[in-house]
Design a protein with these regions (language model features):
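N-terminal winged-helix
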Residues: 2-43
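Hydrophobic hinge/microswitch elements
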Residues: 45-50, 114-169
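Short hydrophobic/charged patches on amphipathic alpha-helices used for structural packing
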Residues: 41, 45, 75, 101, ...
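Beta->alpha turn/N-cap motifs
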Residues: 36-37, 53-60, 88-89, 140, ...
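Pocket-flanking alpha-helical
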Residues: 41-44, 48-66
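Short, well-ordered beta-strand segments
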Residues: 2-7, 52, 86, 110, ...
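Flexible hinge/capping segments at coil-to-helix
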Residues: 67-109
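Secondary-structure junction motif
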Residues: 12-15, 61, 97, 101-130
Length: 169
């Protein structure tokens, strides 16, 4: 059995899909856990997962590196990325090339709940310390995407979008 724990990223799910396809065996057992930041670390530490995928920034790196060391978990950087606004194609700002935080102020920022470890150091999104006028937290990616459409919400992310998994909306 091979298991991966990850924060809520479609690029990580896509990579998992590619691994399963590449194995090409008649029988196998895999597990994927899309979960909160602390749970990703716990799952790797307890060997529930062989691999964990997390977002590190200059802001949270020292705290998370300390946790990795305390939990005897090794961090390997996969890539670096910029920050992008993620919103649905029908959003009033969707046609803009660039969007400022001030322009986003009247729309709800959508973020992933981190449970008992709801420190901004555990946030999956960049700018977790910014004072948002409207903030909604959700537990899963499907709910976040529904809120994005239903409330013209947005989130801040890496910009790595997998259309074949997310769709084009």
């Amino acid at each position: 059995k091979f298991s991966v724990s990850m924060q809520h990223y479609t690029f990580a799910v896509k990579a998992f899909v590619e691994v399963v396809k590449a194995v090409g065996m008649d029988e196998y057992e895999f597990a994927v856990h899309e979960t909160q930041t602390n749970q990703v670390i716990e799952n790797v530490r307890n060997m529930k997962s062989e691999l964990g995928i997390l977002f590190l920034s200059k802001f949270n790196e020292a705290v998370l590196q300390k946790l990795f060391k305390e939990n005897d978990v090794i961090f390997e950087e996969l890539f670096t990325c910029d920050t992008y606004v993620y919103l649905w194609k029908g959003h009033p700002l969707a046609d803009k090339e660039e969007i400022t935080l001030e322009e986003l102020r009247e729309y709800p920022c959508l973020s992933f709940e981190q449970g008992g470890y709801n420190s901004f150091y555990f946030a999956e999104e960049v700018l977790s310390t910014y004072e948002y006028k409207r903030l909604i937290k959700a537990d899963d990616r499907a709910t976040l995407l529904n809120l994005m459409v239903g409330l013209n919400g947005y989130t801040l992310c890496s910009g790595i979008i997998c259309e074949e998994l997310n769709g084009s909306d």
